[in-house]
Amino acid sequence: MAEFDLCALFSSLKVGDVSSSDELKKHIQSASKERTPLTEPGEGQSMDIDEEGGRQDPGILYLYVDCPTMMRCFYGGSLPYNSRHGALITNLPPYQKDVSLGEVCRGLRQASGFFGYEDVIRSAYFAALSVPGYFVKLDGQMELTSTKGKSLTFDLYASNQLRLEPGALVRHGECKFGME
């Protein structure tokens, strides 16, 4: 794909003019319904298997990085190595109302062992990905404390296959954590 085409695609997938958690949620859900996966799991790729032996598609998963890192990843066709497991993503949506950005940063740092999450800027930007078959669900989960003191748990997924297909990126933009 030509560089201009990649630039246009990256720009068209950016979530803009969204000021609340609810607006971001609606935008991502709409994009999720409209998308047509451009890649299918191939032979030799990791897949989640549920208790009855069928493949699970976790749907949209989220990568938290800063915007320049996301741009480099997209244009370079690769995911960042942001944990000891390779690329780490989660089902924590970037519009979660009852959790602060600082708490998300703490949870990502603890889950990944990655020093980059010391700075909240590292988790203030998201990429919503549709990557069936590329990621394996980890045994551990990310545990966060809500703004009301409740325990929240989110699944973690990882892959050491760091190739990123342009069709895997559903949307990207600024997180709207803690915005009620």
UniProtKB/Swiss-Prot annotation:
Composition bias, Basic and acidic residues: 26-37
Region called Disordered, residue ranges: 26-54
Key words, A-Z: Cytokinin biosynthesis, Glycosidase, Hydrolase, Plasmid
Species in which this protein is naturally found: Rhizobium rhizogenes (Agrobacterium rhizogenes)
Xref: InterPro entries: Glyco_hydro_41, Glycosidase
Function according to Swiss-Prot or TrEMBL: Hydrolyzes cytokinin glucosides thus liberating free cytokinins. Contributes to the root inducing activity.
GO molecular function: beta-glucosidase activity
Top-rank taxon: Bacteria
Entry EC no(s): 3.2.1.-
Gene Ontology terms: biological process: carbohydrate metabolic process; cytokinin biosynthetic process
Protein name in UniProt: Cytokinin-beta-glucosidase
